[in-house]
Amino acid sequence: MNFARMENQDLSGKTVLIREDLNVPVQNGKISNDARLQSSLPTIKLALEKGAAVLVCSHLGRPTEGDYEEKYSLQPVADYLSEHLNQPVRLDKTYTEQEVTVAPGDVVLLENVRFNVGEKKNSDSLSQHYADLCDVFVMDAFGTAHRAQASTEGVIQAAAKAGKVVCAGPLLAAELDALDKALHKPKKPLVAIVGGSKVSTKLDVLISLAKICDQIIVGGGIANTFIAAQGHSVGASLYEAEMIDTAKQIMQQTDILLPKNVVVADKNQINFDDFLNSLESATPIHRSIEQVGEDEMILDIASEGAEHIFEAVKNAATILWNGPVGVFEVEAFSEGTRLLSEAVKDSAGFSIAGGGDTLAAIHKFNVEDGVSYMSTGGGAFLEFVEGKTLPAVAALEANHSK
């Protein structure tokens, strides 16, 4: 992939606008998960070390464009950055109306870009306004790289047209390098783990991976559809009957690894309006995939008869992981995902993991140190795996030589 990188730019005395993904959960003014903020700090610190005057922008939540709502304000993020950068970080709320004053060595956080009319529609005028704020634009938000919006793709085009430097920040570059290594230059065997509730939502991912993977491990509702495609009853389990023919086609293209045994629970013990809490008191039962009862729901893969799955992961040279293989939030149905995460950790291969549930499982089972790269992107991660063009990345590549 060919794009300019921030670490190679002369930023001394220049005003640098960094688009980060600071979209973190905030409850009552408190940040409950700071993972994205932690990931953004090295980029901001590097810009400061290079002598830049730093502007940072991001979205938070889904406010109504044109309306200020305090619950979507980035003020808690500004306070967090102040604490972790050991210097004041001012939140600027008037940057769309007047010039922003920032000196080299200082950091100013621009208020939520989604308050601005035209942000989501990639307004030319708003994109130009963002570009006018800076000498150098740094795209560092992989999590929004798949969206053509004013603060992602639009500003890149506007800044480049004005002859300004547009480049990828270290976080975005690392994401793209890791995905490129896993998908375009993988060492073999390449094994993918794809979990989730529906084949239909991951169909493009499965089709793309079937072309390049030596083996694919499927979990969750996706696995149920593949089990049904083998002619087995999945009882009351979540599955998609209309996707069975598609599952059969995918099974002809690559080696789909399925468990021989599963962990089920009686559907009558489950309150679907309070799913996770009701599972805490449900009785786990181990079944062969050939013996699932009509009132039973598959909720995890069983460790017995899954040795071939864990061995495939341990022996892989490249692992791509998106999605747990069971309801790992509940102890009785977490063993499959736990053993799988430990297999990833024990593998000597290069591993990349993406998706909120996947990262939550990695943290729960304390295998962070055993995963080569954890992607901060959700939708962007999936779209890259599907082979789709990420607008912000395409804009960086198109303007690299300009």
UniProtKB/Swiss-Prot annotation:
Annotated positions binding ATP: 202, 329, 355-358
The keyword Coiled coil is assigned to this record: no
Binding site for substrate: 21-23, 36, 59-62, 114, 147
E.C. number: 2.7.2.3
Any GO BP annotation: gluconeogenesis
Main location: cytoplasm
Enzyme class: transferase
Top-level division of the source organism's lineage: Bacteria
Catalytic activity: (2R)-3-phosphoglycerate + ATP = (2R)-3-phospho-glyceroyl phosphate + ADP
Signal sequence, start to end: none
Biological pathway: Carbohydrate degradation; glycolysis; pyruvate from D-glyceraldehyde 3-phosphate: step 2/5
One term under GO cellular component: cytosol
Keywords: ATP-binding, Cytoplasm, Glycolysis, Kinase, Nucleotide-binding, Transferase
Subcellular locations according to the entry: Cytoplasm
GO MF annotations, alphabetized: ADP binding; ATP binding; phosphoglycerate kinase activity
Keyword Secreted: no
Database matches in InterPro entries: Phosphoglycerate_kinase, Phosphoglycerate_kinase_CS, Phosphoglycerate_kinase_N, Phosphoglycerate_kinase_sf
Subunit structure comment from the entry: Monomer.
Similarity remark: Belongs to the phosphoglycerate kinase family.
Protein's UniProt name: Phosphoglycerate kinase
Organism, scientific name: Psychrobacter sp. (strain PRwf-1)
Lineage of producing organism: Bacteria, Pseudomonadati, Pseudomonadota, Gammaproteobacteria, Moraxellales
